[in-house]
């Protein structure tokens, strides 16, 4: 995903797990091997080595994974295989539009990091629950959020 800040293009690298939760977000000025390494190292340090890694067909991912010696876990084959990652950009885009864009790379990085955590907390996937269970889960999430903010 890219974002323009003062006419310059910046890229948001996002890692999403199999359930659609945002694991990590990194903002860079380029889409190259160095940027891919930055994201992958953060993920490996925090979550360990995954079973498979699904990406788009950007060559930077393959180069970074070869350097980290995890290229055997890389999966780019299959139609629509990375839809979960692509769809994770939509809530961020909506907030970006509401905030009338970003003006600094630093504020974009802070926002992307925080937005992923907050979205994961409140994203209840209401199509999986009955209305009553959804309301209970949402109320519990809101109570937990208020407790965190009260500290």
Residue ranges and their predicted role:
Residues 69-79:
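Short hydrophobic/aromatic-enriched beta-strand-loop microsegments
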């Amino acid at each position: 995903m890219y974002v323009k800040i003062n006419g310059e293009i910046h890229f948001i690298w996002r890692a999403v797990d199999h359930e659609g939760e945002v694991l990590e977000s990194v903002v860079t000025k380029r889409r190259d091997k160095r940027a891919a390494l930055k994201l992958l190292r953060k993920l490996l340090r925090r979550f360990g080595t995954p079973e498979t890694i699904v990406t788009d067909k950007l060559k930077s991912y393959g180069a970074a994974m070869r350097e980290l010696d995890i290229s055997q876990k890389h999966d780019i084959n299959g139609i629509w295989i990375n839809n979960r990652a692509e769809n994770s950009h939509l809530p961020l885009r909506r907030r970006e539009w509401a905030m009338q864009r970003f003006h600094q790379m630093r504020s974009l990085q802070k926002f992307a990091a925080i937005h992923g955590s907050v979205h994961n907390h409140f994203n209840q996937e209401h199509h999986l629950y009955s209305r009553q269970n959804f309301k209970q889960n949402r109320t519990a999430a809101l109570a937990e959020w208020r407790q965190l903010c009260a500290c």
